């Protein structure tokens, strides 16, 4: 009886540890897939930058003012710069 109880408790402990380890591994894999902090900061900054806005300075004579454009691996989508 004691041997069976010890075996059941040991099996339960191993199962709990295995489940916890599997969850931690899954979380670490999800973190590896995500972008590094430096890229996240760039995305946050660029997300706030509108790439297709009217000029801050009004037209001078016949010259059209230039609209801001995305560059460096970014493209304009829905009036916002997004990473290509």
Swiss-Prot record:
The keyword Disulfide bond applies. It holds the Pfam family Toxin_20. It comes from the Eukaryota. Belongs to the neurotoxin 12 (Hwtx-2) family. 02 (Hwtx-2) subfamily. Postsynaptic neurotoxin. GO terms for molecular function: toxin activity. This is U4-theraphotoxin-Hhn1a. One of its GO terms (cellular component) is host cell postsynaptic membrane. Keywords: Disulfide bond, Neurotoxin, Postsynaptic neurotoxin, Secreted, Signal, Toxin. Expressed by the venom gland. Residues 1-22 form the signal peptide. Disulfide bonds join 51-65, 55-76, 70-81. The keyword Nucleotide-binding does not apply. Residues 23-47 form a propeptide. It comes from Cyriopagopus hainanus. It is found in: Secreted. Coiled coil: none annotated.
């Amino acid at each position: 009886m004691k041997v069976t109880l010890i075996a059941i408790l040991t099996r339960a402990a191993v199962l709990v540890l295995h489940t916890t380890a599997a969850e931690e591994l899954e979380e670490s894999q999800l973190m590896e897939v995500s972008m590094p902090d430096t890229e996240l900061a760039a995305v946050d900054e660029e997300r706030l930058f509108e790439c297709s806005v009217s000029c801050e300075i009004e037209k001078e004579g016949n010259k059209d003012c230039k609209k801001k454009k995305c560059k460096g691996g970014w493209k304009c989508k829905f009036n916002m710069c997004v990473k290509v």
